[in-house]
Amino acid sequence: MDANNSNEPFVPAYLKVAVPNPKSNRAPWFKNIAPTYAGIFLSVVFYLQLAAGTLSQGPIPICILALVVAGLLCFALYYYTPAMLGMQSGQPFYVVCTSTFGASGGYLPGFLLGALNLGFFAVVTFAATNFITLGLHSRSTVLFAIIAILWGYAMAFIGIKGIHYVAKVAHFLSWVPLCMVLIVLFANRTGISQYRPPANHPWAAFTGILEIVVGYFAAAGAAGADFGQNARDSRDVKLGGLIGIALAIVVVGSAALLAVAGAIGAGATAPPGAASPFEFTTAIFNVGALSGMVFFLFAAALLVPTTFCMFISANSFSTMMPRIPRPISTMVGATIGVVLVITHTAGNLLGFFQIVGGSLSPVCGAMAADFVLCGKKWLGPRQGINWAGYVAWVIGSFVGMLGIVPGIPQSWKNADHPAAVYSFLVAFIIYLMARPRKPRIIQA
């Protein structure tokens, strides 16, 4: 491209250096997409507080039905479009989103995904550190800080290696939490039939499950483009998502809810350090003498989601800022994450899920609308900034985070459930109404 030609459109540096992943480097869905996504849902962070505010409000069948719906929504609304765009273009999220937000406007969703995955890195590191200290039967703050530092930097180093290394590790480690969940479920099985929810608000239980699952998955869903670029065809995209996302949500989520229900049905109370008896740690302590080993194995299995989050975050910042070496940006991000862990800021899981779902759901909604308008094809980056995408994102984010916006009537907040799903739909509709003109494609 002639830099002296004033008629040539501005092309950001991260687009100039973007190179598609060739077909020869791609692999079947069962070698990358499915095992890595399944590892994310097998992470104890997913179901640690899944029963809080859900199982306590409604019966078990309603909660399991909500998991089925949540799994299908995560696949169809959040994962499918980015993954298909990644497969078609061979490019990661930060490139494919420029069709929706523009070449100059792609910085926002790129940095947003990177920042939120950095937050997830901190959240997962906090959980791993906490479980290791629980396994050691220690509440020492010094030990907690030392473990957080060692875990955080070690996982960041692994994250630099890339998704192929993470996928290889996932093949083995994904079996560990699955076995642990089944052991915990078996240990609490006798109390399941005795469980009775303390409240009868089935809609609150149903929407609560949707919000937690979607909020947990939104960042990984947008990162579907990064997985799609490693898929050979649409069949890999579909099967990898249905097995690794939809099925994993139902199987893992149901087992965790049943284990907690069994523990409470048998009379278990909240263990030390737990916010309520509906945390999954209640069910783990009910295992008995082996609970310490179970905590250690759950922590070891968190290697997969920790490295996944750091990989996506590092990929984001290195793509947006190609002049900064990837190892440097990764270690800076790891330092920020470790600080959040040591200060216990990363311990508020449900609050973090609400922010993730509210801010990334409209990004996925706008991208899905653009995908439909473009004939379900990747047409390349738009020149400049596509304001239709930004307007859809702003309005959708407002809807998605209405619950934490001050001055909003409580009746509005009560009606805004499931907020993350509503924010997706609002952004999707707003973008369709804006109907931006056919993309002015930047020629490479």
Regions found by a protein language model. Name each.
Residues 36-40, 67, 110-111, 137-160, ...:
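Transmembrane alpha-helical segments of multi-pass small-molecule transport proteins
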Residues 366-444:
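C-terminal membrane-solvent junction of multi-pass transporters and transport-like membrane proteins
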Residues 146-188, 200-201, 241-245, 353-365, ...:
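Membrane-interface loop-to-helix entry segments
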Residues 1-61, 74-75, 204-211, 229-239, ...:
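Membrane-interface "cap" regions at the ends of multi-pass membrane proteins
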Residues 67-101, 108-116, 436-439:
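Juxtamembrane transmembrane-helix boundary signature
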Residues 51-55, 83-84, 127-138, 150-173, ...:
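Membrane-water interface regions at transmembrane-helix termini and the short interhelical loops
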Residues 38-43, 69-78, 113-122, 176-187, ...:
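Selective recognition of specific alpha-helical transmembrane segments in multi-pass small-molecule
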Residues 27-47, 185-191, 198-261, 286-307, ...:
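Hydrophobic, membrane-embedded alpha-helices of multi-pass small-molecule transporters
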